[in-house]
Amino acid sequence: MKSSAKLMYGPTVFMAAMAVIYIFATMHVSDGGSVKGVEWVGSVALVLSAGLTLMLGVYLHFTEVRVDVLPEDWEEAEVADKAGTLGFFSPSSIWPAAMSGAVGFLAFGVVYFHYWMIAVGLMLLIFTITKLNLQYGVPKEKH
């Protein structure tokens, strides 16, 4: 069995056990202010949480059966075995910083509820996203 599926089966067993304990505990606890019986909100939450982690574990199990041995399942794997290509990074690009400024301007507009700041921030954000995506689509002499 693969490691990701095991990581999800553990919480499933824990939450299912806690749901059973919780249901039996709330059935037999009686204090002066409540009616004796199952406390439904916590019971349903624990059962649904166990079901959701079970679904995720089964999905990961079925998915990982179809793939080859992963580096995290191989005992002699190195960190570099998992590392893939990170992609191209442009260290001289101004557009990520400009985009952050546009997001900040837009956030100030939302916080202070100024419509003109929201509109200008959205226009700046669209402009900087476009320039970031198209910066290598123009020739070098146009930079």
From Swiss-Prot:
Keyword annotations: Cell membrane, Membrane, Translocase, Transmembrane, Transmembrane helix
Per its record, the protein catalyses: 4 Fe(II)-[cytochrome c] + O2 + 8 H(+)(in) = 4 Fe(III)-[cytochrome c] + 2 H2O + 4 H(+)(out)
User: Where is the major localization of this protein?
Assistant: membrane
Report the superkingdom from the record: Bacteria
GO cellular component term, pick one: plasma membrane
Q: Where are the transmembrane segments?
A: 7-27, 40-60, 86-106, 107-127
Role of this protein: Part of cytochrome c oxidase, its function is unknown.
Summary of subunit composition and partner proteins? Associates with subunits I, II and III to form cytochrome c oxidase. The 4 subunit cytochrome c oxidase forms a supercomplex with cytochrome bc1.
Designated name of the protein: Cytochrome c oxidase polypeptide 4
What organism does the UniProt record list as the source?
Answer: Corynebacterium glutamicum (strain ATCC 13032 / DSM 20300 / JCM 1318 / BCRC 11384 / CCUG 27702 / LMG 3730 / NBRC 12168 / NCIMB 10025 / NRRL B-2784 / 534)
* Gene transcribed to yield this protein: ctaF
